[in-house]
């Protein structure tokens, strides 16, 4: 089934995906409902303020410190780099950065994507005849405070760049007159001298300025956003002090089982400011997160829950859970369930994946997420709800390019529990019990005709055994850099 019909079946009001003809989804006719329980709360270690950008009385009090990216940084995960291999195969890569401000109960989610970068601009008739239709370009989206939205997109990718082996990327939508667009990480002052509209992101630094391009008529938008903040990673993807892991295991080094997914920073602390429309948000040690995905296209349908702000727990807690129905490699359209739940807590990662246990879920088309999983030693259970209407977001699709394909909210009410698993499979000692009112929740793809119940119990045993083999491809291939694939 084409992505167009899949998403329309998810929401019959989504009838057009062309970027020049914005969609008109259900949320346009709904007034988001904010539960009376969802109120700002105070976190002693986080400082945040809001002011107008041009206020004379509110001086800039937060000045983030730029640190250049080092080649052997701590907590670096595999697959931090840009995976484009230079071939004309269908390909996209996307990045997601989130900053949460608990005192204001607001989040900012930055989403970047590049599509078919082998073609730096729209395909010519000859290229279409040779390679088939492709959608090209670079997109930047922000889901920000008060569920407002901003999107800037262009079909050319001449000014997009990404580091082959590190989480360093950027794009220039509009250069300062007389200046040359950067093609690598540059200090903040130089970026501001050369880039009028664009962004750059690294593990330690994130800055940019983008303007809404007017293509969105289904959500409340802001005209522009500007930001600068630094980040101190706390969790990568693995135990603190240990070698960090590939989220999807060693097969992620190869173009099979796509799309691939890598959490680059399960948790960090960010300091800086974001100008969002007419407001300025300043923050110190705000919980932050980053992830990425890449490959030929998104899953057929999927769900996702992520949270870094919790009550009732000591220390840093980070949750990432997600799953989907993805196509298996081959000539036939065969799909499998894939999912994971991972919690970083007290310096340790509690990992629940198909190759070390079973993940089960129950998802409504919108508003309810329930996931439980177990491995040899632990059991986890999470439940998330939202009364918010959510905001439709765009994602790179193979059929129609950057198009509305999912729905998100950062106001999810979440309960998370982890127990020790006893010899008979029952729950033992409670390791973690916590809750949040700032979970990010998402559903995507389709069709979503009703509740989706699924699990990973049918994961082939051969695949489970293969994924448990402790292959360190990053180190092995690093001995011969010529053979090390891009991104790894």
Swiss-Prot record:
GO terms for biological process: chlorophyll metabolic process; fatty acid metabolic process; phloem sucrose loading; regulation of defense response; response to high light intensity; response to oxidative stress; response to temperature stimulus; vitamin E biosynthetic process. InterPro entries: Tocopherol_cyclase (IPR025893). It is an enzyme of class 5 (isomerase). GO terms for cellular component: chloroplast; chloroplast envelope; chloroplast inner membrane; chloroplast thylakoid; plasma membrane; plastoglobule. Pathway: Cofactor biosynthesis; tocopherol biosynthesis. Its EC number is 5.5.1.24. Its main location: plastid. It comes from Arabidopsis thaliana (Mouse-ear cress). It is found in: Plastid, Chloroplast, Plastoglobule. This is Tocopherol cyclase, chloroplastic. It comes from the Eukaryota. GO terms for molecular function: isomerase activity; tocopherol cyclase activity. Keywords: Chloroplast, Isomerase, Plastid, Transit peptide. Involved in the synthesis of both tocopherols and tocotrienols (vitamin E), which presumably protect photosynthetic complexes from oxidative stress. Catalyzes the conversion of 2-methyl-6-phytyl-1,4-hydroquinone and 2,3-dimethyl-5-phytyl-1,4-hydroquinone (DMPQ) to delta- and gamma-tocopherol respectively. Also converts 2,3-dimethyl-5-geranylgeranyl-1,4-hydroquinone (DMGQ) to gamma-tocotrienol. Residues 1-76 form a transit peptide. It holds the Pfam family Tocopherol_cycl. It catalyses: delta-tocopherol = 2-methyl-6-phytyl-1,4-benzene-1,4-diol; gamma-tocopherol = 2,3-dimethyl-6-phytylbenzene-1,4-diol; delta-tocotrienol = 6-geranylgeranyl-2-methylbenzene-1,4-diol; gamma-tocotrienol = 6-geranylgeranyl-2,3-dimethylbenzene-1,4-diol.
